[in-house]
Amino acid sequence: MEFSFSSPLLYILYFLLFFIVRQLLKPKSNRKLPPGPRTLPIIGNLHQLRGSLPHRTLKKLSDKHGPLMHLKMGERSAIIVSDARMAKIVLHNHGLAVADRSVNTVASIMTYNSLGVTFAQYGDYLTKLRQIYTLELLSPKKVRSFYNCFEDELDVFVKSIRSQVGQPMVLYEKVSTYLYATICRTIFGSVCKEREKMIKIVKRTSLLSGTPLRMEDLFPSMRVFCRFSKTLNQLRGLLQEMDGILEDIIVEREKTTEILKEAKDDEDMLSVLLRHKWYNPSGARFRITNADIKAIIFELILAATLSVADVVEWAMVEILRHPAILKKVYDEGRGICKEKKRVTGYDVEKMEYMRLCVKESTRVHPAAPLLVPRECREDFEVDGYTVPKGAWVLTNCWAIQMDPEIWPEPEKFDPERYIRNPMDFYGSNFELIPFGTGRRGCPGILYGVTNAELLLAAMFYHFDWEIADGKKPEDIDLTENFGAGCIMKYPLTLVPHLANE
């Protein structure tokens, strides 16, 4: 049998030799790491993470080893945070120490090498971008200014469902179409002629990036051998195509439209970003570039479609599975809107019960059960244990939100629990952090939740719903599929009927 230099066996032999030499030369440490399961040589604890639902696997391990747990994931150390007390200590009390982002190979490609808010490292750049997000792009005032846009696209969405009355439809696909339309309009201000191309790229990108961690992320010493991965090359090609589309849009806007120095209430997101490029109104030491703008636009499109579609689908399925809750949602929405032709954002602000349903859905089914990993910038101590510099910090928000000591009957979908315990999910209550918290919390919570609430309100106002194929609500398969987010393994298929019939 002959081997060429490209033979996988040579890669494996090289890696084993490299690993053994590195371990022999590695200085011994007296640090006391958090408890965790025993490790195996080379792979560490990877054998214990087998399975498709890591948030559930990690919860079982944390139940045994504690809410602050150490795992060895290949060559990398990972600290797993699994209860509210520990989340507050690590993410709040030591927030600056864990403010960096752990950037994997796929994320690096998709974000122009860590530009944008999600994967930028902590510092002046991230601070500036978060200010732009929270004060201008996605502020409460700005989100309200988008109501007309949301409602116009909602009319198209409702009309599309009306054309399928009595016929089965896949909810996730229908909802995603609306979300792509709204985020493109709020970014570009009008119907973008390249929208369909961008949507295809985003869908393909989300499929290719569905595996959260790749071999080269777990074993950085193997990165040189993964450079020519087919998947990574496909991602690079998609991002190059998206880059060309966005560059043309930016150049065309700068040629044909005056970039205003002062903000306007009705300006789109691209106008905000271009103003910061041209005039730097925040007075930061640097101006944002076209690369920054393209990275921001791409992350906005991804976050505003995939995560929000997850929220809507899980909320819909839980409401349908509970007839008493379903009746309250129907009655509330139809009582507030009465004979109106469309549901507005201001109507939704009055739908307190339906909004509690969305909140409870994000507790039971967070779109990201494991918050985007952070990376420790320096050693620090927690309860006598050392969280080491360079370690990944993984927060299992699903485990926190399933804690029976905080949430009675945690598996039960109970929107009314917030009447008794009115906590919110904006990051100040560490018992409920589906969108993260602190310096790395999601700056787009209000935009995403508003869109999810508006979609659900319109669907329950205009239509009655039944499960396709004659299934009963209690027969819906709730099996999860973990990838870029946590979605239903078997997409929810429903049959709409006009409400007045």
Curated annotation (Swiss-Prot):
Q: In which pathway does it act?
A: Alkaloid biosynthesis
The cellular location(s) given in this protein's UniProt record come to: Membrane
GO BP, one example? indole alkaloid biosynthetic process
State the annotated membrane topology for this chain: Single-pass membrane protein
**Superkingdom of this entry's organism?**
Eukaryota
GO molecular function terms here? heme binding; iron ion binding; monooxygenase activity; oxidoreductase activity, acting on paired donors, with incorporation or reduction of molecular oxygen
Name the residues that span the membrane.
1-21
**pH dependence of function:** Optimum pH is 6-7.
* EC numbers: 1.14.19.80
Family affiliation: Belongs to the cytochrome P450 family.
Q: Mind telling me what this protein is named?
A: Geissoschizine oxidase
Which species is the source of this protein?
Alstonia scholaris (Dogbane)
The beginning of the lineage is: Eukaryota, Viridiplantae, Streptophyta, Embryophyta, Tracheophyta
